[in-house]
């Protein structure tokens, strides 16, 4: 009998899951709360299997459904899924659906910040293995699409957000990584405890021979080591570890099974900042357990230039470097960007306010920024927090165009201009990549 699945959400993940499930022979009802359109080829595939695209009242569809697959943008708790659970219908995330159709190896990577850089780096290292590899999840296309043509010998690097992890059930990566945990997405999870619990789902179904890689420098994450059913490998930027991956005199060092391995020195990297050192440590640990050789890790690291919108160098204008850190959608990410510079920063911040605490960030802004330029919905709250922290020069503007123009007029060497918003982008842009590209285009158009 054909299985009927309702896929809730018609974005990249939802459409990817719908396509994959239909190709597996399922009858797929792709559902959206609002009127929407999808690719004609996908719509025809769904109709061929007896499904289709449905908008509006999803409750009328539940009588036909055996399972609901949620896109990351749909909260686990909502009226439709609450009703489905009462009816005994299984509700899972798109990541869980992808996992159930895949039989290869997985490195799952989560954390508040650094996921995309670490996952990208892991993906590059995995490419050196003599087996098929892929990267997916919260990066690129849906995980369901990435695993379609991968066999049991493949390795997959999966970037996983808390949204994706809150709906997993049996998901079990061979290697699980938790990079860090700071306040974010509290508008959805409401408490840090709920946010952390979603992150912990990445290792809950692991077995004793699996590996979980945890940040030793984060007290909360360190405490999670006792909860893991798998082997724990720590990474640390500050401590020399008897067992794990750490910095030893600036050298990235692996200590495991009474053996020491040196990968490379941090000064040889082409990315900078303490946060990137943590990303590299986690990537090295992940790929060590996937069988990547030390020499191949070293070669990839020496060539790696980072990821777009993550502390990305744009260009130098009149002696002033401009950096695009549009991916900084929370204060902790902006703190990491500020820490990467010695000072003399003209900081562009603001956007859609997630209502996270600003005090630690503004304390660092006061110490490192010459000028703070604020825009977006958050600018009034950010202004109050900056003034309370003693930030001297605070400017408010209405648009990104005005922000870049003002920064250009004020900036002079040895200053740097840094876009690191500490906010999501939805008040002014479709997403953070759109915000970053717009910023880069404005910088490119400045008089030289």
What are these regions (language model features)?
Residues 27-34, 212-216, 348-349, 368-377:
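Short internal beta-strands
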Residues 12, 75, 113-117, 277, ...:
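Residue-level detector of alpha-helix initiation sites
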Residues 56, 92-96, 229-247, 298-302, ...:
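Beta-strand->loop->alpha-helix junctions that form or flank phosphate-binding loops
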Residues 1-108, 129, 302, 308-312, ...:
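Short, basic phosphate-binding NTP loop
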Residues 4, 22-23, 61-63, 72-216, ...:
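Phosphate-binding loop of NTP-binding sites
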Residues 42-47, 359-415:
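C-terminal helical cap/extension that packs against the catalytic core
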Residues 3-4, 16-24, 132, 264-370:
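Nucleotide phosphate-binding/pyrophosphate-handling subdomain across enzymes
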Residues 21, 68, 109, 138, ...:
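Residue-level signal for inorganic ion chemistry
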């Amino acid at each position: 009998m054909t299985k009927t699945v309702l896929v809730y959400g018609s974005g990249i993940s939802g459409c990817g899951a719908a396509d994959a499930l239909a190709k597996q022979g399922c009858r797929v009802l792709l559902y959206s709360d609002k009127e929407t359109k999808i690719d004609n080829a996908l719509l025809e595939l769904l109709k061929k299997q007896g499904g289709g695209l449905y908008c509006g009242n999803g409750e009328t569809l539940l009588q036909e459904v055996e399972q609901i697959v949620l896109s990351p943008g749909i909260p686990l708790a909502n009226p439709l899924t609450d009703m489905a659970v009462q009816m005994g219908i299984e509700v899972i995330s798109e990541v869980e659906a992808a996992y159930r159709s895949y039989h290869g190896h997985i490195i799952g990577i989560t954390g508040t910040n650094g996921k995309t850089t670490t996952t990208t780096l892991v993906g590059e290292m995995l490419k050196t293995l003599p087996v098929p590899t892929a990267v997916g999840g919260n990066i690129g296309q849906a995980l369901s699409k990435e695993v379609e043509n991968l066999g049991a010998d493949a390795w997959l690097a999966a970037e996983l957000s808390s949204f994706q992890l809150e709906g997993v059930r049996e998901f079990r990566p061979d290697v699980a990584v938790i990079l860090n945990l700071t306040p974010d997405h509290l508008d959805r999870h409401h408490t840090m405890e709920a946010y952390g619990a979603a992150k912990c789902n990445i290792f809950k179904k692991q077995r004793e021979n699996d590996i979980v890689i945890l940040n030793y420098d984060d007290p909360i994450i360190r405490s999670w080591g006792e909860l893991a059913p798998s082997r724990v490998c720590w990474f640390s930027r500050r401590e020399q570890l008897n067992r794990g991956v750490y910095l030893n005199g600036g050298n990235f060092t692996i200590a495991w099974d009474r053996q020491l391995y040196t990968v490379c020195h941090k000064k040889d990297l082409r990315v900078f900042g303490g946060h990137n050192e943590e990303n590299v440590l986690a990537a090295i640990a992940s790929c060590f357990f996937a069988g990547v050789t030390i020499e191949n890790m070293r070669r990839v690291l020496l060539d790696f230039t980072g990821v777009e919108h993550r502390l990305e160098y744009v260009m130098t204008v009149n002696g002033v470097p401009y950096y695009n850190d549009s991916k900084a959608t929370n204060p902790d990410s902006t703190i990491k960007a500020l820490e990467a510079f010695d000072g003399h920063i003209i900081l562009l911040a603001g956007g859609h306010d997630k209502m996270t605490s600003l005090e630690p960030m503004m304390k660092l802004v006061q110490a490192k920024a010459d000028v703070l330029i604020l825009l977006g919905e958050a600018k009034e709250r950010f202004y109050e927090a900056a003034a309370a922290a003693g930030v001297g020069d605070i400017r408010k503007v209405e648009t990104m165009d005005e922000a870049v123009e003002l920064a250009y007029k004020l900036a002079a060497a040895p200053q740097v201009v840094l876009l690191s918003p500490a906010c999501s982008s939805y008040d002014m842009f479709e997403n953070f990549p759109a915000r970053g590209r717009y910023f880069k285009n404005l910088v490119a158009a400045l008089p030289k």
